[in-house]
UniProtKB/Swiss-Prot annotation:
GO cellular component: extracellular region
Cross-referenced Gene3D superfamilies: 1.50.10.10
Protein name per its UniProtKB record: Endoglucanase 13
Organism expressing this protein natively: Arabidopsis thaliana
EC number, UniProt record: 3.2.1.4
Cell compartment(s), UniProt: Secreted
Glycosylation-annotated residues: 6
Keywords, sorted A to Z: Carbohydrate metabolism, Cell wall biogenesis/degradation, Cellulose degradation, Glycoprotein, Glycosidase, Hydrolase, Polysaccharide degradation, Secreted, Signal
Catalytic activity: Endohydrolysis of (1->4)-beta-D-glucosidic linkages in cellulose, lichenin and cereal beta-D-glucans
Length: 490
């Protein structure tokens, strides 16, 4: 009998050891994925670079491109980022990308440093802000686009070979764009905070631009696509009130000046929102004001309470504890809209991650209609979304290119889908690119590491086809929010 007991004991301990080893290996695999994903997310921005590439460029299949941008307006507009899978520089989504990169650098600074990616994260941010500084040559002048969207999209060319028009478009006092100027002000203000610890002089330059742009946006009201009609078919703005709030919130955080807080408390809060994205920043502004309230840095008022309430309502809905919960796919992905859904998922995931830090610091929680949320609950939801994106989904596919082995091989991306100019300098023509590369059934010759595609549909189904642009096209606005989240959940 005792031998049986001893045998059972040994069996039990062996089973426990095996389970612990398997769990440890699983944790290590997840950690490895986070590390790989964080590194790749920043490499992606190097693949999106426009202009003269620096000596420390790590994505070596790319080359210099668009070196005459701005020449039609007698201004240097080289640099910046191509917005997605085309060769366009759209200022509106670029500015949002910049703000989110800055927010990651601010909120997750210690985590980025611990994972040895802080330098790369700041370089990704500076590539954007250097361009935005060039694009703002006068207080009331801001260049908001380089390139012709329609002609660019009719061609399938490497950025290094571009022959499409590179027209420069601007807003000014006579041709306003409060949304574009406001978002760019937010980007500059947020970036000034990110750079202040390491480069105070550069931070001061950025805050000067931010103040001028906010004043410009307020004084000359209007939608930017009315001044730059070419942008309307690609990144039309639905309004500018959110960008003005967003800019004021970042300027207040950067300067602590009362005038920006006054603007926030005198304006409408935006009410309940269903998304946070390049065209709707109300949630971002609400979260920044809620942070002030949690820290006790502002006097409580009906308006401040509403900002916090609206921010937390969005979070409750993302965490499935609200009155109007965000739809989830059967596999567990937060699903907002069919076209490039992951841009909304990554932005919402950033909000959850940042707010978890604010709650933890304040030792606070959120009272949702369907129960309380602690800081750890928010982080758990954020991690579940990251895990889904990196492969814990019904397709067993990572929707970030280059992570693991099963990831999209044919993202809708001109530069990645055409042989590198480093390998073959033969120019690729406008129609030739479509004939030889766009319609090629083979995987893209260049791995666009770190690119997050649009993602699966509401049934967790994804079609890995270059022509499937709604699902297969990556964009800077999708990856930017994920940088900080990856650093935090790692």
């Amino acid at each position: 009998m005792s031998q049986l007991k001893n045998g059972s004991s040994q069996c039990l301990w062996t089973s426990i050891c095996i389970v612990l080893i398997v769990m440890s290996m699983a944790r290590e695999a997840v950690s490895t994925n986070y590390a790989e994903a964080l590194k790749n997310s920043l490499l992606y921005f190097e693949a999106q670079r426009s202009g003269k590439l620096p000596p420390n460029q790590r994505v070596t299949w790319r080359g210099d491109s668009a070196l005459r941008d701005g020449s039609d307006a007698h201004i240097d507009l080289t640099g910046g980022y191509y917005d997605a899978g085309d060769n366009m520089k759209f200022g509106f989504p670029l500015a949002f990308t910049t703000t989110m990169l800055a927010w990651s650098n601010i909120e997750m600074a210690s985590q980025l440093r611990a994972h040895h990616e802080k330098g790369n994260a700041l370089r990704a941010l500076k590539w954007a802000t250097d361009y935005l500084i060039k694009a703002h040559p006068q207080p009331n002048v801001l260049y908001g686009q380089v390139g012709e969207g329609n002609s660019d999209h009719k061609c399938w060319m490497r950025p290094e070979d571009m022959t499409t028009p590179r027209t420069s478009y601007r807003i000014d006092a006579q041709h306003p764009g409060s949304d574009l100027a406001g978002e760019t002000a937010a980007a500059m203000a947020a970036a000034s905070i990110a750079f202040a610890p390491s480069d105070k002089a550069y931070a001061n330059i950025l805050i000067g631009h931010a103040k001028d742009l906010f004043a410009f946006a307020k004084a000359h009201r209007g939608l930017y696509q009315n001044s730059i009609p070419n942008a309307g078919g690609f990144y039309a703005s639905s309004g500018y009130e959110d960008e003005l709030l967003w800019a004021a919130a970042w300027l207040h955080r950067a300067t602590n000046d009362q005038i920006y807080l006054d603007y926030l408390t005198e304006a409408e809060t935006g009410g309940p929102r269903t998304v946070f994205a390049w065209d709707d920043k109300f949630v971002g502004a609400q979260v920044l004001v809620a942070k002030l309230a949690l820290e006790g840095k502002v006097e409580s008022s009906e308006q401040i309470v509403e900002y916090k309430s609206m921010a937390e309502q969005f979070i409750c809905n993302c965490a499935q504890k609200g009155d109007n919960n965000v739809k989830k796919t059967p596999g567990g992905l937060l699903y907002f809209l069919p076209w490039n859904n992951l841009q909304y998922t990554t932005a919402a995931t950033f909000v959850l991650s940042a707010y978890s830090k604010y709650l933890e610091a304040a030792k606070a929680s959120i009272d949702c209609p369907d129960g309380a949320l602690q800081a750890s609950d928010l982080l758990q939801v954020a991690r579940s979304q990251v895990d889904y994106i990196l492969g814990s989904n019904p397709q067993k596919m990572s929707y970030m290119v280059g992570v693991g082995t099963n990831y999209p091989k044919k993202p809708h991306h001109r530069a990645a889908s055409i042989v590198s100019i480093r390998q073959d300098k033969t120019p690729v023509t406008c129609s030739g690119g479509y004939d030889k590369w766009y319609n090629n059934p083979a995987p893209n010759p260049n791995v666009l590491a770190g690119a997050v595609v649009g993602g699966p549909d509401d049934n967790d189904v994804y079609g890995d086809e270059r022509s499937n642009f709604q699902q297969a096209e990556p964009a800077t606005v999708t990856t930017a929010p994920l940088v900080g989240v990856l650093a935090l959940v790692f």
